[in-house]
Amino acid sequence: MFTGDADNVWVSVNRFFGEMIPTFDMARKVTLTVDLAKVIEDFKDIIAIAPEGPELLIPKDRLTDSEILQFYLLAAYVSFRLGKRLTDAMTKEELQAKLGKSMKITATRLGELVKQSIVTKTEDGSFRIATIGVKKLQEDLKAIKTEIW
């Protein structure tokens, strides 16, 4: 709380903000955030949000199993952020059905993604894409699109 006459309070307020704004600016520089509008724009040709759930618009045979899982989790993330889904997580069973491979392969790929911190496992055993996972997908997008098209 600032006390004193108006001039002293004004000086104190300016000093406070002068000290705090650089701290906020530094914190902003190291805080990892996702620009949802950019994610939607970047991935609009790859993922879709259907009433039935997350979908891919590209042939799965052009992607690795890990990429497929990441794209489905990204679609769930976007769907949740847009209020179209109750959670941004998907169960192992949902992901296995989307991947179209055995549960063992699905679990192995998910385990690898968790180990790389691209995906996180929730308390109930579901999976969600991590913020760093979204960023890495954005960084890898050009190479992935080259492989696809």
Task: Label each region the model flagged.
Residues 114-124:
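A short, conserved structural fragment
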Residues 132-149:
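Short, amphipathic alpha-helical interaction segments positioned at domain boundaries
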Residues 1-3:
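Short, cationic, amphipathic peptide segments
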Residues 71-79:
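Short amphipathic alpha-helical elements of helix-turn-helix/winged-helix folds
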Residues 80-98:
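Short acidic, hydrophobic short linear motifs in intrinsically disordered regions
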Residues 97-115:
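Short amphipathic alpha-helical interaction segments
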Residues 89-92, 125-131:
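Minor-groove-contacting beta-hairpin "wing" of winged helix-turn-helix DNA-binding domains
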Residues 5-63:
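Long, low-complexity, charged/polar intrinsically disordered regions in eukaryotic proteins
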